[in-house]
C-alpha cells in the first residue's frame, strides 16, 4: 500500500457526452499493491488537509511523519500536529501532545476498522488519453470518531438545548404582585408616545441605567442620540440574536397597543418561525426583520379574555393600573430583556436575581419536561401514536424518537415492534387497522396540529364495518373528522404557557377533549337500518309476490337488488357484494359493452316515454310492496318506502326462507331434470312427486337418510298447508307472474328473487304461464315412467339370495355417484346463490366455480378409485358365480368384498371425501345452471330488442348483435371443451376397464391350469395305491397306468398348447 494518502477531488470534465467510448485494450494490474476504499470523518479529513498544507511536514524526521499501523483488521493513523493552524496562527504546543489525541507521541490519532466489501469495485486512474485499471477494491476502511467529535457534539447540543429552553413565553396573570413598578410619566410623554417607546427600547439596550421602568429624559438631544443609536444597534443585535429570555424584567406589565410601539418591542423578540411545539408562537410572519401590528396584537390578545383594543396610551396610568382597570382589560405582554453581552458594552440588570429565578422557572415549564416524560413512556405506545399521525419511514421514525429521547434497550426492540403494529409498503410503515383501538386521542404529548391531524386520519382508518354507508362517496366525513373547507374547531392551550397559533386571532380555544365531547354528544354514529317487513310466501305455482310485479311495472328504469336471506355461515369472499374485482377474467370486454349499451338504450327509451313518472312510480311500487303483501296490516311500516329504487327492500328472516324452500320442490324437480345435464341433474333434484316413489326409495337407503327424507316430506306438507292458509292475504297480482315461476322452477333451492327491470305487458306474462304449464306436463311423463320401472325392480328384488345381495351391494357402491334416482331429496341449501341479475354476479359465480373445480377434480379421482375397485370385485364375483366349479373362488371374492366394505365404512376420510364430493357436485351444477339461465335470458332479451319500434326508428345496433354472436360462440366453445374432456375421460376409463378384464381372464386361466395339475397328481397317487393293494393284476394295471400317463401327457400337451 502506498504511503501517500490523497484527498478526494473532482476530476476535470474532460469528457463530454457522445464524444467518447469505452474499450479495453489490455489489463495490467500490479499485484504488489492492495487498494482500499476509505470513509473519513470530518475531523480526519481536516487533519489530512492540515498535514498537506504544513510546509514543515516535509522536513520532519521519519519517525515524526504521518504513520499508519495495522493490527489485524484494525489499526491507527497518526498525524503530527502542524506548526500553524488554518488561520496561520502558530500553535502553542507545536508537535507536542494534543489534548484531543490519544496521548503518547503527540499529534492526532484516529483508529480504523477494515471490512470486506459486499460487492466488487475496480480502482480506475485517469491518464492523458485513457483510463487505467489499477486493480480490484475488495476492502473498506472506516475511520472511527475521535473524542473531539464527541466534545464538539456535546457542546453543540448544550447550546441548542439552552436556545430551545430560552424560547418560551411567560403568562402574566392579573393577580400577581410582582408585575412591575409604578412609574409616573411626565406630561410631555403624552403627545409623543411612539417616540417614547422607541427611545425606551434604545435606552434599554444601550444605556446602563435600568433601575426604573421608564427613563426620564431631561433633554431632547439625548433622546435623539439614543434613537439614532437604537436604529443601528437593533439591527446588529437582531443579526446576532440567538435567544431572548422572557423573564420578569421591570417592563413586564407593559401593554402593547399602537403599531409603532409594537414594532419597537418586536425588534427584541425572537423569530416566531423558529419556535416550535407546545407553548410557543407559530404562524406569525416577519416583514423587514420586524413584526407587524397584527402579530403583536395577537400576542397580546391571547393572554386576556378576547380583548379587542390594546394599550394605546403609554401615559396616564401605570401597567398595574391598566391591568386592574376592569373594562378595557388591557393585557400584560412580556417584554424581552436582553442578555448580558451587548454590542455597546453590556446591559446590567438591577433585578438579576429575579431574572435568574424566572429563567429557571421557565425552563421547568417549557417543552423540555415534556420530552423527558415521553421518553419514560413505553416504546410500543410511542410508536403507535407516532404512526397514527402519518406513515413514517424508518430514518424519520428513528430521528423523531432520538429527538424525544430513547433508551438503548428500547432501540433494539423497535424493529420487532414495528413488524407487530404496522405494515410496510413503499419503505414506509403504516399503522395496522386493529392497532387503532390502542390510540389515545388525549395523548398528552400531541400538539394541537397533531391532534387535528389525528382526527382527520382516524375516521379514514376506523370506518365502522356495520355502517350502512361505509362504501358510499358521501360518507367521507365523520363526527370527529375536520373538513378541509370548514374552519378548524376551537381548541385551547393545554400546556403551561401555551399560546394559540394564528396571527390576529381574538377567540380563546377549547381543549380537544371538550371538542370531542361536544361533537360526540350532538352527532350519533349511524346504525344499520333493519327492516322488520316479512314477506308472505305464496304456493309453488305463484312463488312471486305482488311486490315484484309492482316494482317491475312501476319502476322499470330503476335497478333493484335481489332480496334474499344471507346464509348462516362464515363470511367468505362472496359476502361483500359491493366490491368490484377486475381480476376475474370471466367475460370479455365486449360483453360489458353490450350490457352497458343495452342498459343505456333502455334508459333512454324510458326517459322518452316517461320523463316525469319515474320517481312517482318508484314510490307507488314500494308502497304497494308494503300494502298488498302484508294484507292491510300496517304494523310493519318501518321499512323504507321512499327512494328504494337502488337499494334492497329488506332481508327475509330465517323462517321465511325455510317456508319458501319446500313448497316449490315439485316444480323444481320436474324442471331440473331437463334443464341440467343428465349426470349432474340427479344430485340436486328436489323432493319426490308421489308417495310411492318416496316409499320405494326408502328401502335402499340407510336409516338416517330415510329419517331425513321423511322429516323433509312432513315439513313440506306442513309448510304447504300453511301456505294455503296464507293465500287469502295475497292479491290477485301474486298469481299472474310467470317469470318468477320459470326462474324458481329452473333453480335448485328455496329462495326468492326480484326479476330484472323490464317493461313486459300482462299478455306476455300470460303467454309465459301457458308455456310453463306445457313444460310441466311434458316433464311429468318421464318421471312417471321412471317410477314404474323402479316399482318393477323392487318387486323383482323382494326375496334376493345372499349372493345376489352381495353383488347388488358391490354394484350399488360402484355406481354410488351423482346418478341417484330423481326422487332423492336435496340435502343442500343453495339459497345464497340467487339467480343472476347483473354481470357482476355472473363474474362472482364463475370465479367461485373455478376456485372449487380443482378440489372437485381431486375428490372425483379418489371416489373413482374406490368405485373402480368395487366394480372389479363385482365383476369377478359374477364371473365366479357363472363358472362355479367348487374351488372356492366365489367364497374368496365374497369375503374380499365384505372386508373392503367394512374397511371403507370404518375409514372416516373416505366418508368425508364422499360427502364433500357430493356437495361440490351439487353446488357446481347449481352455479352452472344459473349461469346458463342468465346467458339464455340475456340472449333472448338482446334478440327481442331488435324488432321493437324504438329500435326500428333509431336503426339496428350492429355492436349489440356482434356482442351477442360473440357470447354465443364463447358458450359454444366452452360446452364443446367440456364435452371433449368428458369423452376423453370416458375413453380412458373404458380402456382401463378392458385391460383389467384381460388381466382377470389371464389370471383365471392360470388358476384353472394349476387346478388341473393338482387333479392329475391326485389321480396318480390313487393309482399307485391300487397297484400296491392288488399284485395279481399288476400287468394290466401297468398297461392302464401307461394309458393314463399317455392320456395325462396328452392333456398336459393340450393345456400347454392352450396356454
UniProtKB/Swiss-Prot annotation:
Keywords: Chromosome, Coiled coil, Nucleus, Transcription, Transcription regulation. Residues 1027-1059 have a biased composition (Acidic residues). Residues 853-883 form a coiled coil. One of its GO terms (cellular component) is euchromatin. One of its GO terms (molecular function) is chromatin binding. It comes from the Eukaryota. Pfam families: ELL, Occludin_ELL. The keyword Nucleus applies. Residues 188-241, 258-273, 322-369, 467-485, 543-562, 612-624, 640-650, 660-697, 759-795, 807-824, 1002-1026 have a biased composition (Low complexity). Residues 990-1001 have a biased composition (Basic residues). Residues 171-277, 314-374, 450-509, 522-581, 598-827, 968-1059 are annotated as: Disordered. Residues 494-505 have a biased composition (Gly residues). It is found in: Nucleus; Nucleus, Nucleolus; Chromosome. Component of the super elongation complex (SEC), at least composed of Ell, Cdk9, cyclin-T (CycT), lilli and ear. Component of the little elongation complex, at least composed of Ell, Eaf, Ice1 and Ice2. Associates with RNA polymerase II. Belongs to the ELL/occludin family. This is RNA polymerase II elongation factor Ell. It comes from Drosophila melanogaster (Fruit fly).
